[in-house]
Swiss-Prot record:
The gene is rpsH. Part of the 30S ribosomal subunit. Contacts proteins S5 and S12. It comes from Cellvibrio japonicus (strain Ueda107). One of its GO terms (cellular component) is ribosome. It comes from the Bacteria. The keyword Disulfide bond does not apply. HAMAP family: Ribosomal_uS8_B. This is Small ribosomal subunit protein uS8. Belongs to the universal ribosomal protein uS8 family. One of its GO terms (molecular function) is rRNA binding. One of the primary rRNA binding proteins, it binds directly to 16S rRNA central domain where it helps coordinate assembly of the platform of the 30S subunit. Pfam families: Ribosomal_S8.
Amino acid sequence: MSMQDPLADMLTRIRNAQGVGKATVTMPSSKLKVSVAKVLSDEGYINGFSVSESPKQELTVELKYFEGKPVIAELDRVSRPGLRNYAGKSALPTVRGGLGIAIVSTSKGVMTDRAARAAGVGGEVLCTVF
């Protein structure tokens, strides 16, 4: 059976792994997933990630905890295959008054809402992180 929404699967795997206190989580890799993992790493929500070149490419995400609790409190999918969510540069969402981030897929690559505003581009709002 094929996977309908690979990014939602990635976010769910991260949420579930953090819920049970795992140090790492492994999933099938794709360019979009690697880009999202890079944004999460750059923003300090995960410790890092790696892509293995085994028979099938796998993405391993190293989860981050603070005082025994997950750093990521909320990880929600916004745009999904059945209902895409696009926002112009002036309509990009702020998450929790700027405390969280929205990950946006733009013509200049996958970036945070703040970086997209600074670059003056809009795009598809993939997910929000707090």
